[in-house]
Structure formats: structure tokens, C-alpha cells
Amino acid sequence: MRTYLRVERLVNRLSDLQAGTSEHDHHFALQTLFELMDMGSRADLRGDLLKDIDRQKGVLAGYANNPNIDESALNDLLRQLDDAHHSLNETTGKLGHSLSESEFLSAIRGRMGIPAGTCEFDLPAYHDWLKQPVGARQKAIAQWMRSINPIPSVLKLMLGLLRDSAAPHSVVAKDGMYQQNLPQSRNVSLIRIGVPDGAGWVPEVSANRLLISVRIMRIEDGHRTQSMKADVDFLISNCG
């Protein structure tokens, strides 16, 4: 799950940077693309997503013929899962593996691991590319981004279904501590906690199959954290 969330964060960042117009935007877009390739080389995202799609289809199939369920919406979700499964089966190799064959990108990737390693005298061809018109750079990055398809769209579908599987409910952390027992019959894959902007505190979460534990940490000067000794209301969703 943490791998899914990290990939989602990188994909969103890459999309934002690709749409940018400055040389710095597109430099960091490539850096983000290389981070995605690094993650893809260490994790079998395709295999994990295929397993999770099959599991999700099994869960949704259990709602068939339920009078309280919108059959049209259910069939639409099952169709989306079938399409996602098919698109993943049509792909081969690791995330972005085809980009490894580009000498241009491989040279940039190799130098990005070195502090200030992408100066003009290190990578003149790269800096020539950075001086191209904005539209040309955006088009090139969009083309390179296709190498990670269909992972972003499949991941968006799966995480969306997971997040929508539970409604948030209000709880109170007494003296900054909250614990909740989990039923053995339910598999919780993701815990979501609502933190208001500027709240001045962050949650420190630990969990296993049977118990969720949340400690509220106050943010002090210097961005240090300290256990809070006050009651705190917050929203929590146990998704799974």
C-alpha cells in the first residue's frame, strides 16, 4: 500500500511539472520520472495491481443481486476493473523500462545522482534540450510519460475504490491518544485521518491487523514534535 501511495505522489507531481513552463519545471519532471523508474525496478507494481484487481472483483461480485445496490453502477465498476486488468496484461517489463534504452535519458539519469551533476559542461545536449520551446519540451515529456502507462490510471481507479470504501467518522483522542480495535473479519488496508490546515498538530499512527493506535503530536518551534496532552477531535476512515 505504501508503494502505491508513493507512486501516486510521484505521478501527480510529474503531471504538475510536465504542465509547467520553466526549465526548472521540466528538469524536476525528468527527475520525478527517474524516481518512478527506480521504484518500478524494485517493486512488481503490475503483478500487485493484477492481484488486487482480482480481489476487488471478488468483493464487488458479492454484491450482485443485492436489492440495495445500484446494479448499473456495480456493472460499470466491474467493467472498469476488467478494462484495467486487460490493459495491465497487455504490458510487459518494469515501470518505464523502455526509457532505459534512450542514451539521452540514461546520460541525464546517471548525472542526476551527482550534486550539481547536470551542469552545461557535463550535459551540453541536455541544456540544448532545455532551451527548446516550452511546447516541444512538454510534448517530449508527455511522450516519455506514456512509458509508465497504464499504471497511473489503474492506480487511480484502485485507490479511488479503496478510499470510497469507508465514510469518515468523528473520534476523540483523549489526552492526545486514540486506540481502536479492528474486527478480525475485516481487512483494513488504508487508514485516513483528516487534519485541518494549520491545525498545529500531526498524527503519529501505528497499526496491525487488530489495533489502530494514533498519538497526536504538537508541532513546536523548529518543526519539532511533542506529544499533546489535550483532547483532540478528528475524522478517521478505515478503508478496506
Please describe what each predicted stretch is.
Residues 84-189:
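Charged, well-structured binding/catalytic surfaces in domain cores that contact anionic ligands
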Residues 23-26, 71, 141:
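Conserved phosphate/pyrophosphate-binding and hydrolysis machinery centered on Walker-type P-loop NTPases
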Residues 187-240:
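Extended, charged low-complexity segments
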Residues 5-8, 12, 34-38, 54, ...:
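Generic structural signal for well-ordered, non-transmembrane alpha-helical segments
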Residues 41-104:
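Hydrophobic/aromatic-rich structural module bridging two neighboring secondary-structure elements via a short loop
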